[in-house]
Curated annotation (Swiss-Prot):
The keyword Transmembrane helix does not apply. The gene is Bag6. Its main location: cytoplasm. This is Large proline-rich protein bag6. Residues 73-105, 553-593, 655-666 have a biased composition (Low complexity). InterPro entries: BAG6, Bag6_BAGS, Ubiquitin-like_dom, Ubiquitin-like_domsf.
Length: 1129
């Protein structure tokens, strides 16, 4: 039999199989073609799921279409692993090569919303072989409040339980120590030149071994029966005995080690051989102590529960991931660990393969506070200027480390823990970066050359607010305190700084900042733009919650090292990767006096911060004179991109509000008389110190590329249009083609034009005050307004005014409907007020588009759109008695009406964002009531004569958009419907009200005389509602096959109803082609009876050819095709 399988991506595949084959065998047969394993396939035919044990012929699917969907992965259930804490619970894992999403507990009903995604293979693309074969496992807490998702990127290990891993790790470390002791006891002195390299290799081996427990713990649960995986206490005793023997062998060298260090301060070491021998003992004994400490840490968390039944085994009290450092993500090497209430936490370990980790942030070194304290108590601390990592030559490369990403879903009190470290690989950079520390209740600080330390905090705060708003579906009030941006200028010393100690008092959040070391100066524009792009893009991919308020930064040079902090004391299930969350304060270490950068670097930094801050003057002069920091306070605006706006605003002197992308060149939407805010007041010209626009463009493009990198596989250049981007993601090719189901009329065509010509980069630049995209779009806008707005008429003031009136009259019903549920001032006619206001604004904007041809086109158009927006908000706020909530509800209600087919979660997020933006926008309203009084229309005012004379004119008599208010086609009417109206003349003109033919001349609405007068408006309203109804999409094969035969007969058509003019019009819209003559001329030529007949003949001939070539076609089975396509209809 022949079976067609249709997948969710609308692809169909035809298979020829034996009729006796079972459903299970059929799944196996097609699995290689569809790319879905048999156990995950779900075959559906006529609404029923095909059972695997039945034969395919029982379902009568020969020649039919079967729908194939992928079965969701089963929910993983944790199994108990002994009387231990939640971290020792044995996880239940699911192996997958493509990193599928692991099962998660119930996400608090409707409070869950996804505001960002990331593609793991894309993020891990820079890790080479280490990113091959990822495995996913989950661990649930005892109370069900946490879910840890472990993504293991290392190879499968033979051991399966963490206690076993701890013992194996300790044994391997002891073997390393024994090899070092062998060298101490019998290694010739002449081989000491190779000791640093050997030490580095040994350290690399130990580091890879030490990270094995964290990797291995993720594989727990993959084997349900592994009694030997849990070690017995006797095995622990054997390891402890081995530790004792190693300590005994090390004891004499420890004695010599102490003697050398006690005299190291003053000894001259004139004998070179003696000095080299002492140095060798210091190096090897120090390495032995490090390994010995790691071994003690590995086994110190092992416990035995004596109250459990025998045979007893060991368990751990805290996982090894408690000690490991964060993982290095791509783009500027940003290690990031994030814990978000009701979202996700990411931690991990490892570095890039070719990167030399320093002693303070290497992933293999346990950085918990307990381990350094123990290490410092057992060893003599190094001198002030000594760097422990100096023993490792730059040419040594450590062994690859296992890469593990740990994602924790937290459903309790929100906690934020972030650790960032931009490692410097250039000359003069820090070679030893101390481990960051955490303060309880403080704010996160990120120190980067040329960037504000609270950059990510500001952005993440904004994103989190929107995530919470979307999750709750409610508005969120403004912040209690405005965020503070502290910009710290780093120095660029030409020699290593003299280390010193400086302590600063705790900041408002109760935390201070560790600022050790020194950094190089800022790089060029290209590298800095890439660094900013990576930073912002990585953050926007992972929503986070940060602490309220800010922290003080010391007046000293900064290093690419940040602190970790916690903003909640009630959530203790997750800890930072570097320190415990119980610490409350820590000292601030900064470099001593450092030289000022050269004038060129200082001037470049001044230009950079001038561009980022958008300020020039006294603030920048502080930087030029050497002042290390400046604090800028901005309003607390919880908006999605407010942090990006305040930092990356390149040409403005004050923070400017933004909104979700809506083109500033676009007039208010046709179906909404209350457009959402597109941009605030126009920005002034760029300051002289600002960087060129290309820098801003590269930053924006890099941010979007980083955010959408996993989705933009087809185009990484940032030039892909919005329409192409959405069409590629949705898999549909008619989203922005005005037809019966899409946006129609003038506004639909305008939206199509904008989406096909603007990229996401262009839209973000518009929202930030850059008018260059509008300037580039000038030819297309002018041509569009001439054809679609004026219909090839001359752009005279009278024609423009008539076109504006005809266009806005179609919005009357929408305006009346939108303001019906709110309280309006008693003496204000809000419908006429909005209509005439929109007419005036359209007149201004259209006149500018059609007549302005100089270089100020884009900037002036942006200013006019911004001014129109603010005036519209102020005008309606006055009409609604100053009630901001009423104005917000009008806008949100219109959005909901337009988004009936959109996900409610997304609609809730959009309305929440707009509500918050409106609160800020209305609070900064630059338009006064006196300025909008001229637009207000009172009840009882005599309307203008043209409007009065056009109220009763019928719709059917007006050519192409020359409609009036009551009988005009609604904005959902397609352009094709309008094109079939009878022509008035060969040359299109803008009709005036006096030129409308009377009702007696046309007889188009003779039905109005035969019905009671009170029914006329009801019938007209019903006619308009019917025009807005979407055409039913074509039914699927499965639906038609399961439909009763009688109903199927009643639905059979009588051949194609598509006329030639309709087909050509749709083809023009799909391809963007424009006629050389007017649209009316093309329509008249296509309506010719001879052309229609030829078109009908060609259409039937094409269908006949298709039927002849179709092997599945049978004239006996489909007899109606003869009558429909071969006979004379």
């Amino acid at each position: 039999m022949e079976v067609t399988v249709k997948t969710l991506d609308s692809q169909t595949r035809t298979f020829t199989v034996d009729a006796e084959i079972t459903v299970k065998e059929f799944k196996t047969h097609i699995s290689s073609d569809v790319g879905i394993s048999p156990e995950k396939q779900r075959l559906i035919y006529q609404g029923r799921v095909l059972q695997e044990d039945k034969k395919l012929k029982e379902y009568n699917v020969d020649g039919k279409v079967i729908h194939l969907v992928e079965r969701a992965p089963p929910q993983t259930q944790p199994s108990t692993g002994g009387p231990s804490t939640s971290s020792s619970t044995s996880p239940s894992s699911s192996n997958a090569a493509n990193v599928p999403g692991a099962g998660a507990p119930e996400r608090n009903g409707n409070s869950y919303v996804m505001v960002g995604t990331f593609n793991l293979p894309h993020v891990m693309s820079g890790l080479g072989e280490a990113s091959r074969g990822p495995r996913v496992s989950t661990v649930s807490g005892n109370d069900g409040s946490t879910l840890d998702v472990h993504i293991n990127l290392d190879q499968q290990l033979p051991v399966q339980s963490e206690p076993r891993v701890r013992l194996v790790l300790a044994q391997q470390i002891l073997q390393d120590i024994q090899r070092i002791l062998d060298r101490l006891e019998g290694q010739p002195v002449n081989e000491q030149t190779a000791e640093p390299m050997d030490t580095a290799v040994s350290e690399g081996e130990a580091s890879s071994r030490e990270t094995l427990p964290q990797t291995t713990q993720n594989t727990d649960g993959q084997s349900n029966t592994a009694p030997t995986s849990h070690p017995s206490p006797s095995e622990y005793v054997e390891v402890l005995q081995s530790l004792s023997r190693v300590e005994e062998r090390l004891a004499p060298f420890m004695q010599r080690y102490r003697e050398i260090l006690s005299s190291a301060t003053s000894d001259a070491y004139e004998n070179q051989e003696e000095r080299e021998q002492s140095q060798r003992i210091i190096n090897l004994v120090g390495e032995s102590l490090r390994l010995l400490g790691n071994a003690l840490v590995a086994v110190s968390d092992l416990r035995c529960n004596l109250s459990s039944a025998s045979p007893r085994h060991l368990h751990v009290v805290r996982p090894m991931s408690h000690y490991t450092g964060p993982m290095l993500l791509q783009q500027a090497a940003i290690p990031i660990q994030i814990n978000v209430g009701t979202t996700v936490t990411m931690t991990g370990n490892g570095t890039h393969a070719g990167q030399m980790p320093s002693d303070g942030n290497a992933a293999h070194t346990p950085t918990n506070t307990s381990e350094p304290q123990r290490s410092n108590s057992d060893n003599q601390p190094p001198s002030s200027g000594e760097r422990p990592a100096s023993e490792i030559p730059p040419t040594s490369v450590p062994h690859p480390h296992p890469r593990v990403v740990r994602i924790t879903h937290q459903t309790v009190e929100p906690v934020m823990m972030m650790h960032m470290n931009i490692q410097d690989s250039g000359p003069g950079g820090p070679t030893n970066i101390p481990p960051p520390t955490a303060g309880h209740g403080g704010s996160a600080h990120i120190h980067m050359p040329g960037l504000p330390p609270e950059f990510m905090q500001a952005i993440s705060h904004q994103i989190t607010q929107q995530a919470v708003a979307a999750a709750s579906g409610q508005q969120i009030p403004g912040f209690q305190a405005p965020p503070r941006f502290v910009f710290t200028r780093p120095a660029a010393p030409s020699f290593p700084p003299q280390p010193g100690v400086a302590t600063t008092p705790p900041g408002p959040g109760g935390a201070t900042t560790a600022v050790p070391g020194a950094t190089v100066g800022p790089a060029g524009n290209a590298s800095l733009a890439q660094m900013i792009s990576g930073l912002v893009g990585q953050l926007l991919m992972h929503p986070v919650i940060v602490a309220q308020g800010g922290s003080n930064t010391p007046s000293s040079t900064s290093t690419p090292t940040s602190t970790s902090s916690s903003s909640s004391s009630s959530s203790s299930t997750v800890t930072t990767s570097t320190t415990t969350t119980s610490s409350t304060s820590f000292p601030t270490v900064s470099s001593g006096p450092s030289p000022q950068p050269p004038p060129g670097t200082d001037q470049h930094l001044s230009q950079l911060l001038g561009s980022l801050l958008g300020t020039a003057g006294s603030g920048m002069s502080n930087f030029a004179m050497g002042s290390p920091s400046i604090t800028v306070t901005v309003p607390g605006m919880p908006a999605f991109l407010q942090g990006v706006t305040d930092i990356l605003q390149a040409t403005q002197t004050v923070p400017v509000s933004t909104s979700p992308p809506q083109s500033a060149s676009q007039a208010p939407p046709p179906s909404s008389p209350s457009p959402p805010p597109a941009h605030s007041s126009p920005p002034p010209a760029a300051a002289p110190e600002s960087l060129p626009p290309e820098f801003f463009t590269s930053v924006v493009q890099g941010v979007l590329s980083s955010m959408l990198g996993s989705l933009s596989a087809a185009d990484q250049s940032g030039t892909e249009s919005i329409a192409a981007f959405i069409q590629r993601l949705s898999g549909s090719h008619n989203i922005f083609q005005p037809d019966a189901e899409g946006p129609g009329g003038f506004f639909g065509d305008l939206l199509t034009l904008i989406c096909h010509n603007f990229s996401l980069v262009d839209m973000v630049m518009l929202l930030h005050g850059h008018s260059q995209p509008l300037q580039n779009l000038q030819p297309q806008l002018r041509s569009f307004f001439l054809q679609e707005y004026l219909h090839q008429a001359d752009p005279t003031p009278n024609n423009i005014q008539m076109a504006s009136r005809n266009l806005t009259n179609g919005l009357e019903e929408y305006i009346r409907e939108s303001f019906a549920s709110v309280t309006v001032r008693d003496d204000v006619d809000i419908t006429r007020t909005n209509l005439e206001f929109l007419q005036d604004q359209f007149n201004r904007i259209t006149t500018h588009i059609l007549h302005c041809a100089d270089s100020t086109f884009g900037q002036r158009l942006l200013e006019m759109c911004n001014q129109s927006l603010f005036e519209w908000l102020a005008l309606n706020l006055y009409c609604l008695r100053g009630d901001q909530s009423a104005l917000t509800s009008v806008i949100n209600e219109r959005i909901r009406r337009l988004s009936l087919d959109v996900s409610p979660v997304l609609v809730s997020w959009v309305t929440s964002v707009l509500s918050l933006r409106l609160q800020v926008l209305l609070g900064q309203m630059p338009v006064t009531e006196g300025e909008i009084q001229r637009h207000i229309r009172r009840v009882g005012d005599v309307p203008q004569a043209p409007e009065a004379s056009s109220q009763d004119q019928p719709m059917e008599t007006t050519p192409v958009d020359c409609q009036n208010g009551a009988a005009s086609p609604v904005p959902a009417t397609t352009v094709e419907e309008v094109l079939f109206l009878p022509p008035q003349s060969s040359v299109p003109t803008i009709c005036t009200d006096s030129e409308h033919p009377t009702q007696e001349d046309t007889g188009s609405e003779q039905w109005a005389a035969s019905v009671p007068p009170e029914w006329v408006p009801v019938i007209r309203q019903d006619m308009q509602n019917q025009r807005k109804m979407k055409q039913q999409p074509p039914l699927s094969d499965a639906y038609l096959s399961g439909m009763p035969a009688k109903r199927r007969k009643t639905m059979q058509g009588e051949g194609p109803h598509l006329s030639l003019s309709e087909a050509v019009s749709r083809a023009m819209k799909a391809t963007g082609a424009k006629p050389e003559s007017s649209t009316d001329c093309v329509r008249r030529e296509l309506d010719n009876s001879e052309a229609q007949g030829r078109y009908r003949e060609q259409l039937c001939q094409d269908i006949q050819n298709i039927l002849q070539d179709n092997e599945s076609y049978s004239a006996q089975r489909f007899p109606n095709t003869q009558r429909a396509f071969r006979g004379d209809p």
